[in-house]
Amino acid sequence: MMNPRRLPPLPSSTSSASAADDMDPRVWRRLPQPLVDRVLACLPTPSFLRLRAACRRFYHLLFSSPFLHSHLLLSPHLPFFAFVVPAAGHLLLLDPTATASWSRLPLPLPPVAGGPAAFSPAAASAGLLAFLSDASGHKTLLLANPITRLLAALPISPTPRLSPTVGLAAGPTSIIAVVAGDDLVSPFAVKNISADTFVADAASVPPSGFWAPSSLLPRLSSLDPGAGMAFASGRFYCMSSSPFAVLVFDVAENVWSKVQPPMRRFLRSPALVELGGGREGAARVALVSAVEKSRLSVPRSVRLWTLRGGGGGGGGGAWTEVARMPPEVHAQFAAAEGGRGFECAAHGDYVVLAPRGPVAQAPTSALVFDSRRDEWRWAPPCPYVVVAHHGGAGAAGFRVFAYEPRLATPAIGLLDATAPVALHGMHDG
């Protein structure tokens, strides 16, 4: 577990134009410290990180368990998106709100001398990013908090695999990770046979977690490791191709089932995402995909469906189309995408679609869909230059994840037997 005391800033590429009134020191100097701490705990993470340099006491709040616990409960939800370029050494963070802006944040991964990155981005949840080891065999899954630079590894996965699909669902004191498909049946052959599930919970024994018995994937499954998984209501969802199908994993039952997607013969570059959720309510599974059909009555478009009632043992569920990209926006998007596909993620009410470039190294443009306002808009160009890395993991292209910057990710403490969970943001008192 690494926890350097030097925390990275979150510099914004755009400066706020709104001028706030200066704080009157005659008022703030006389406020009780508990009240000041309460106000600071209500600040968004980027705002507090910029303010921590104001005085030594504010900085030391970063290492106060009671303050981190309050900040975890009181700070507003931030629907950021993390663009991860393998071997680049940093994240590109997109704030998709009306005043969209970009930030850059270094990655806390250990350096690998004399070669490409040994870990590739795989999943994200609750302020944590997951990175999977590139080497074939028994996999190592690293969880990292880029804000605090905490880093911890899950126990080695029990089944040897080549390039599996990974899902992650983290809570304040729990972690569920799924590593599925690409079983190494021999040194030269892989099959999509099984999935391994890691479960850790502060209330269970042992709290440091364990790998549950392997579960069997549905027959004829074909998983794409770059597609990832969505999580909602205790179930993981991932895409299977040739033909397209949605695979559903019930964590409690340790059983997989299959749901048919809408218009499956005409989908291109489909992606499953978690729409909504956060502190406002339960997340819904949504399917975002380009639709291409030769008949003129069904024009080319990008559509978004939500699933209701899916995931039961019978594989039922109904899809409802909730959004369709307007023709003029689709024309711009299709020109930017050029048939190469796109990366997609959802966070709260926002969906981000990033066309893959010809070199597939870094995002050159990103389209934001605000589902609450039913509004499509382009994010400003990313001002940061990403140095291309050829070969190895760097050739895989960027990934985009729903990411919320958090000071406290207490669940990561479950993976370090020498560090109690309270040291990472939870406090009983």
UniProtKB/Swiss-Prot annotation:
Keywords per UniProt: Activator, Developmental protein, Differentiation, Flowering, Kelch repeat, Membrane, Repeat, Transmembrane, Transmembrane helix, Ubl conjugation pathway
Membrane topology designation: Multi-pass membrane protein
Kelch repeats: 229-277, 284-339, 350-397
Tissue specificity as recorded in UniProt: Expressed in seedlings, roots, leaves, shoot apical meristem (SAM), developing panicles, and, at lower levels, in developing seeds.
Pathway: Protein modification; protein ubiquitination
Entry coiled-coil feature ranges: none
Biased composition (Pro residues): 1-11
Biological process per Gene Ontology, one example term: flower development
Induction: Repressed by ozone.
Residue stretches spanning the membrane: 72-92, 112-132
Pfam families per record: F-box (PF00646)
GO cellular component: membrane
Region (Disordered) location: 1-21
Residues in F-box domain copies: 25-71
Chief location: membrane
SMART domains, A to Z: FBOX (SM00256)
Subcellular location: Membrane
Quaternary structure and interacting proteins, as annotated: Part of a putative SCF (ASK/Cullin/F-box) ubiquitin ligase complex. Interacts with FL/APO2.
Domain notes: The F-box is necessary for the interaction with ASK proteins.
Miscellaneous notes: Ozone has various impact on different cultivars; O.sativa subsp. japonica cv. Sasanishiki exhibits ozone-induced leaf injury, but no grain yield loss, and, by contrast, O.sativa subsp. indica cv. Habataki has grain yield loss with minimal leaf injury upon ozone treatment. Plants harboring the PBN6 quantitative trait locus (QTL) (e.g. HI1 allele in O.sativa subsp. indica cv. Habataki) exhibit bigger peduncle diameter due to larger vascular bundles and an increased number of primary rachis branches (PRBs) and of the number of grains per panicle, thus leading to increased grain yield.
Main function: Component of SCF(ASK-cullin-F-box) E3 ubiquitin ligase complexes, which may mediate the ubiquitination and subsequent proteasomal degradation of target proteins. Together with FL/APO2, involved in the temporal regulation of meristem identity during both vegetative and reproductive developments in an APO2-dependent manner. Promotes spikelet formation by suppressing the precocious conversion of inflorescence meristems to spikelet meristems, probably via a positive regulation of class-C floral homeotic genes, but not of class-B genes, and through the control of cell proliferation in meristems.
Name of the featured protein: Protein ABERRANT PANICLE ORGANIZATION 1
